[in-house]
Each structure stands twice: as C-alpha cells, then as structure tokens.
C-alpha cells in the first residue's frame, strides 16, 4: 500500500491508534479510553482530527478483542458493538481489514527484535513448527502460528481463553470451588486477566478468613509484589502458576516446539517477578511430558504494541504476514 494506513488495536479497556506506511513503522500512536467514546467510529474521528496531522488514510487494519464472524463485532469485555462496513463508511476508509487481537499478536512474533523478548526458560525453538501465543489483559487472548508445507504461516483466531480452568494443587482446587459459587463456568480468563486477578484475590481472602479490601488489579499487584499484603501476594503467585498450567496445556495441544510467546497488558509490567515465579516450573509440570515441555522455550513479549507489529505484516505483505 503506497498510502498511510490507519491501524488500531481495540481491547476491552483501551483503543490504540496509529498511522502506518509501507515501511511498517507506526506513526503518531495514541491510546484512547474506550469508555470515553460510544464506539470505534467516534474514537477514530477524534484520533484523525487531533493526531493524524491532516492525513486522510484510505485503508485500515484493525485488531479487536472479539470473535470475527461476519460484519458485526461485539467486543467480549467492552460495550462496543459495531458493523465493520458501517465503521469503514463512517470514517471514510475504502478498505478495512479486521482480525482478532491475538491473531495480530501472533503475526508479530516472527518480526519482533530480540530486545522485545525476555526469555523465561526452556531450550531452543525448532524451526518450522507451531508457535503458541497467549496473554492476559482485560481478557485472556490465545492464538497460534501454524506453518504450511510451502513455508507460509497461518495465525489462528481462537477463543482459547474460555477453556475450563483446571487446578493443579489442593489450594487451587479450593480457590476454583470458591469461584464456582460466583460463576457458572470458571474459565481460564476468569482467573488470568485483570479482573481474574481480582477474582483470585477475593477467593484467597475468603478462604483465609480475611476481608477483601482491594478491588483493582494494579493495587493487588503492587501490594503482592512488595509483600505488604499476604493475600495479594498469594493471589499473584497463584496467577503466575496458573499461567504456567494454561501455557503448558496450550503447548501440548499445539505441539508448539516453535516456542510459546506471552503478551498482554499485565505481565510486561511485572516482568522480573514473572521470570522468577513458579510459571516455568508449572509450565513443565505435566507428568510424563515434563521432558517434552522442558525443551520448549517460553518468552515474554515486552514490545509495547505487538499487535501493531502484526498489523504491519498485513499492511506490507498480507499474503504471508
């Protein structure tokens, strides 16, 4: 594409916008709060009016935290509901491609630079084999890159964050039992997301006979990492361990010998604590398949906008991003 393209990463809490040229570099990136706008069209118009420098893009590539099934988009953890066609027309785009947000993250992993990846154990990746991608944010995103015989890659659009969460210890079983009194289905996302950390904290508090005095993941994380609140500390530790369980299950399901990449808005902000946590031990703790998983490398993506890196692939080389 010779002209600038509008790219967007639309999650449950924030929508990130930028302009992108054929070199794949994001220009004028801006983060807007979804709650401040009635939908993507008003947010896009605000971005273009205030931050685009007079550029009127004709094409768009959006990553959205939603199932992509036809024209209608309903974000999983946001009140935004919109039509792709109507949005395209409302903001004056001639072309608009929309993919799942973690599909875009999956498309990014082969293009990330070493400085945007933090190793969290394991061996070396095996070339040409499946790659797993997951990460907690407002929800729990899950995707994968699957290679073809011709050397091209397909990014899977999945709803793997809604698989049933399994306990690996008696304490986790009690925590999940407690959460089942609140939710008909305790999915992985119910514990591995921003609200999921709050859910874990509340369950741990109840089981420990303490009052749950905190209500935001940021405060729980801070109090857990600095050790000032034992309940918060246990909630964060359980969060890391359950991430290992889910990531290990995903690696086994995919045969992800190409590696496991972890993204999302939560873990990069506590990267060192995550690296030193029980995540990797739990990732490998799958009985007879411990040696199999021990060889699979895991990385934390520290790039601030990995979805934009993936969208750049769609913009510059849509056939084999």
UniProtKB/Swiss-Prot annotation:
Its EC number is 2.7.1.2. Its main location: cytoplasm. GO terms for biological process: glycolytic process. It is found in: Cytoplasm. Gene3D superfamilies: 3.30.420.40, 3.40.367.20. It catalyses: D-glucose + ATP = D-glucose 6-phosphate + ADP + H(+). Disulfide bonds: none annotated. ATP binds at residues 8-13. GO terms for cellular component: cytosol. Keywords: ATP-binding, Cytoplasm, Glycolysis, Kinase, Nucleotide-binding, Transferase. The keyword Transferase applies. One of its GO terms (molecular function) is glucokinase activity. InterPro entries: ATPase_NBD, Bacterial_glucokinase, Glucokinase. HAMAP family: Glucokinase. Belongs to the bacterial glucokinase family. This is Glucokinase. It comes from Paramagnetospirillum magneticum (strain ATCC 700264 / AMB-1) (Magnetospirillum magneticum). The lineage of its organism: Bacteria, Pseudomonadati, Pseudomonadota, Alphaproteobacteria, Rhodospirillales.
